[in-house]
Amino acid sequence: MNESAVYWSRMLTELTLSFHILYATIGVGVPLMIMIAQWTGYKNNDEHYILLARRWARGFVITVAVGVVTGTAIGLQLSLLWPNFMQLAGQVIALPLFMETFAFFFEAIFLGIYLYTWDRFESQKKHMLLLIPVAIGASMSAVFITIVNSFMNAPQGFDMVNGELVNIQPVLAMFNPAMPTKVAHVLATAYMTS
């Protein structure tokens, strides 16, 4: 690969990741804020907080949509621009990549149910419970993708012998030395950003 191609590949990946991290970070903490607003409205019988939760939920859909588009673009870029890394990742660290996808779908399904069931429950409390899987899915999505990132910073769980991957241990790759601090940092900053 020539140096110009590497440079432009880095720039394109950096640009896409810059947009994605903004929306993804907001998307981790906002479900908790919506839940707090709806809970406050329910507990105090205050329609203003219920309306606030409803409007935040609609805005949250936009952040999720932009996150989906940029996340999909990142997946394509990793496959097309960095195939050697993806060959290694596919054999060693694919488990958290798949788990991140599952966590996202978990979040998206319950977000859809939450949005389309306003005023269909006899109690706001029951409706608010739908936000729990949304918040869990958003947080777990961040955890799993951060595990992949921590692997990139402290790779372990495999041996390279004569250019071949051997002794692959996906769980060891997931729980690498960088994982605890990176996951804690990402979750804390995502909640604080929101």
Name every feature range the model reports, one short phrase each.
Residues 1-194:
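Polytopic transmembrane helical bundles with strong interfacial aromatic enrichment
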